[in-house]
């Protein structure tokens, strides 16, 4: 249910107006993007979310609501309420582990997602790369960063292999191991893009695991594994630049030292892969 309001509500106002019988249970602070909190009434639970990026346009938060509204409940939480600065979605019972599931199981989840109807908006990386450059700490803007940005701008994004709806933030912390199978949470970066971009963006432990995930996906998608892996590799510079830029952007927003450490590590990976 979308609900429009020009004036953002406080947490207490939200609960008293829309969920008067519910009470907060716990706050989630895991992950790099921010937290949310859980509300409960007689065994029924919802997750109350706010935009992770306070500087992002409201349209980005609305897109997340729209994506969840059209996705099947077997892979994503169903939304119940959207209004300015707040979204309420189903709580997904299950276990969030610290490591990825079996690559074949994960490939099956991603392939099923990629068979769903498209969201209706494209993921384009270059505007994000340029935004992160502009919004980063000037003292952190290096000649090498600018050189790589210009190189990608000139090269342009790889040609699409297959255009599908993507999650774009697949890692162990966003996967719920439920009784009915794997499900994905945190859909704030979702949009339509190349399936190989999604596979390139998965937070894997090592190259062997990455290759196996791509091979398992290729089998389901009836694509030659070598062809799919080549396409995944074409996206690597874009993804590493995206991660490094996002970490730099979040460092300037929050001052949290973990983002500097992650940015430095990603810059080192970029140098190795050039």
Swiss-Prot record:
GO molecular function: ATP binding; thiamine kinase activity
The protein's annotated pathway: Cofactor biosynthesis; thiamine diphosphate biosynthesis; thiamine phosphate from thiamine: step 1/1
EC number: 2.7.1.89
Record keywords: ATP-binding, Kinase, Nucleotide-binding, Transferase
Ranges in a coiled coil: none
GO biological process, one term: thiamine metabolic process
Alphabetical list of Gene3D superfamilies matching this protein: 3.90.1200.10
Highest taxon in the source lineage: Bacteria
InterPro entries: Aminoglycoside_PTrfase, Kinase-like_dom_sf, Thiamine_kinase
Reactions performed catalytically: thiamine + ATP = thiamine phosphate + ADP + H(+)
Function description: Catalyzes the ATP-dependent phosphorylation of thiamine to thiamine phosphate. Is involved in thiamine salvage.
NCBIfam families for the chain: PRK10271.1 (NF007620), ycfN_thiK (TIGR02721)
Family: Belongs to the thiamine kinase family.
Name of this chain's protein: Thiamine kinase
Species per Swiss-Prot/TrEMBL record: Escherichia coli O6:H1 (strain CFT073 / ATCC 700928 / UPEC)
